[in-house]
Each structure stands twice: as structure tokens, then as C-alpha cells.
A protein has these predicted regions:
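Acidic low-complexity segments
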Residues: 83-147, 151
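Short hydrophobic beta/alpha edge segments that flank linear recognition/processing sites
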Residues: 50-65, 80-83, 90-97
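Gly-rich Lys/Arg/Thr-decorated short loops/hinges at beta-loop-alpha junctions or inter-strand turns
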Residues: 103, 156-171
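Histidine-anchored nucleotide/phosphate-binding helix
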Residues: 176-192
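N-terminal, Lys/Arg-enriched amphipathic/low-complexity engagement segments
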Residues: 1-42, 57, 221
Length: 324
């Protein structure tokens, strides 16, 4: 959790829909997207970039690399310091909006994964810059986690459908609104790592839809997500060991793949529409803004832009709490 002086703590509310955020006039895209990879800029101030163009990349490590994409079309106006989602400070590239969009507003037919091999899916995940946000303050490349988990004899993946911190709502709301896509993204990852099965861990109050029959085993378990802690690796492993009688779940360990609904939604969108990570759903609320919601915003959108989209600040806030 990162706290900035001057904005109030978040509140919980019930939401009926998601909202597409305004396209900002400019964005500041962090160079560092995950905790391990060090990227280098591929463009410089004055260059013109398109939406979805790769603007930074890291060296390959066992074939895995980190990549950063421009979330909007425009002109690179400078390099400046910015705060990453996990609270670290790094270089950021400011891009001024200009030109036409490649993805925004385009209707594309989802790709059919049935004819794709696990290797093809893995390469797509690796190329599109998908970050596994299961551990919020230690984001890592999903491809890196898949590669590590796939090395196990009987690899298992666990998908948490709620936020590990009860004060947050992002993953819970994504599960509520996009469970079908989260499920599809999970199947893609399972195929990419040749998983023995998928374990979905949901809040006890969440009504799981009836799941279509799959070739891969799927197990759904529920827990009290309002109890802290309940969504970390240790708690999920204990939950599985206590409640599962499925033989394939016996191999679950800290070396298994643990991920969340946000990451699985990103995976679905990246593979199905060939779309790199250029936007993200965020939950924003507080008693100093007149509205709150789950908003899809461009990567690099500032907190000021978010506040303005919720009606602007109505009073001087006490603190901004990010990821908490």
C-alpha cells in the first residue's frame, strides 16, 4: 500500500456497471512495469508514436522479456520522474495525444484459441507485456511466472477472484462484470503452461455461474474474502489442502502459478484481440469526490485525471491511498 499526503481512504460501494474513462490529453508511461526487468527506451522526445506501439523493452532472460507500449497515439514530449503502481519511482515517458487510434473504438472479432498451441499462447502472453498482479507490490511478468510454474511435475494454477485486501474492490468487480472473460483467460494460461488443472478461489458471497465442461479439470472453492488475510499463497494452499479431494490438486505449492482476475482479463484481451497492455481497470472512490466506480483508463493516466473523471475533488483530501 502506498500513501500520498492529502487524499481520503477508499469506501466500498455496490456497482452496476463499468465505465470507460476519458482519453487524457497526455500520459506519463512508467519505464518499469515489473520488479525484475530493466527496460530501455526505444523512442525519444520528438518521436511520433502510435497506439499500441512498443516504446521500451528489456533484454531477454530465458526467452522472457518485458515490453512497454504507448497507450495513445501522439508525440513524445519528454522523459520525467513518475511513481509506479507499486509505489516505486522510475523514469516515465510523457506522450501528448495526437493522431488516430489503432485499437480504441475498433470492433474486432475474438481469435479462436482452439486451433492454437500452448506455445503460441505463451508467445502472445510474453510479447504483449502482461503483468501478474497477484502480489500487488511485487508485479512480475506473467510469462515468467508461467515458465517457472510449468517446470513443476504436475503444474497447478490458482486464480483468486477477489482482492487480497478487503479494502480494495478492483478484482472483485472485474470478477463480477467479466467472469466469462476471466474464465477464458484462465483456460488460455492453463494451455500455455500445460496445467494439471485450474483452481478458482472466490468469495463465499459470490455466485459462480455454471461453468462449461472443459478438457482440463476445474475446481471452485470459496472462502471469506472479508477476513484478512485470506487471499495470499499460504491461505489458498491451506484452503485447497483442507477442502479438495481431487488428486491433481495435491501438487499445489508456492511454486504453483497464483494469479488474479485482473491478470486473466488482460490475458484474454491480449490474446483474443492482439492487444498489448495499454489500458487497465481501476477502482476509485473516496469521500472527497462526488462519484466512484470501476473505470477503464489508459496506462499513464494521472491521479488528477482520475479525480476529474469522478467529478473533481469536492474538498481538500487527507491522503491518497493506492493499492489499499
Amino acid at each position: 500500500m502506498t500513501v500520498f499526503p492529502n487524499i481520503s481512504p477508499l469506501k466500498k460501494n455496490m456497482y452496476k456497471k463499468t465505465v470507460n474513462g476519458f482519453v487524457p490529453n497526455s500520459v506519463i508511461v512508467p519505464l518499469k512495469q515489473d520488479v525484475n526487468a530493466d527496460c530501455k527506451w526505444l523512442v525519444k522526445p520528438g518521436d511520433k508514436v502510435s497506439e499500441g506501439q512498443i516504446i521500451a523493452v528489456s533484454d531477454k532472460n530465458n526467452g522472457i522479456f518485458s515490453s512497454v507500449y504507448s497507450p495513445i497515439p501522439g508525440i513524445v514530449t519528454g522523459i520525467e520522474s513518475c511513481v509506479c503502481p507499486d509505489g516505486r519511482t522510475c523514469e516515465g515517458m510523457r506522450i501528448q495525444l495526437s493522431g488516430s487510434f489503432s485499437f480504441l473504438g475498433k470492433n474486432k472479432k475474438p481469435a479462436d484459441a482452439r486451433s492454437c498451441t500452448g506455445t503460441m499462447i505463451f508467445e502472445s502472453i510474453n510479447e504483449k507485456g502482461i503483468i501478474n498482479t497477484f502480489v500487488t507490490n511485487e508485479p512480475v511478468l506473467l510469462a515468467e511466472d508461467i515458465q517457472r510454474a510449468a517446470a513443476e511435475k504436475k503444474p497447478v494454477m490458482a486464480v483468486r477472484l477477489f482482492d487480497e485486501d478487503p479494502s480494495r474492490l478492483t478484482d472483485s468487480l472485474i470478477t463480477q462484470f467479466f467472469f466469462e472473460n476471466v474464465f477464458s483467460g484462465s483456460l488460455l494460461v492453463a494451455k500455455a503452461m500445460n496445467a494439471a488443472g485450474i483452481i478458482f478461489v472466490a468469495d463465499r458471497d459470490f455466485e459462480l455461474p455454471e461453468l462449461p465442461e472443459q478438457k482440463i479439470p476445474v475446481l471452485c472453492l470459496k472462502t471469506n474474502a472479508q477476513k484478512y488475510p485470506s487471499g495470499y499463497k499460504e491461505e489458498i494452499i491451506r484452503l485447497v489442502q483442507k477442502n479438495s479431494r481431487e488428486e491433481w490438486t495435491a501438487s499445489i505449492s508456492k511454486k504453483s502459478l497464483f494469479t488474479d482476475s485482473s491478470t486473466m482479463l488482460e490475458t484474454y484481451r491480449a490474446f483474443s484481440f492482439g492487444m498489448p497492455v495499454i489500458d487497465r481497470y481501476v477502482h476509485i472512490s473516496g469521500d472527497c469526490i462526488p462519484a466512484s466506480g470501476l473505470i477503464k483508463v489508459s496506462i499513464g493516466t494521472t491521479l488528477q485525471n482520475l479525480a476529474e473523471q469522478c467529478g473533481a475533488l469536492t474538498k481538500n483530501p487527507g491522503a491518497v491511498i493506492v493499492n489499499g
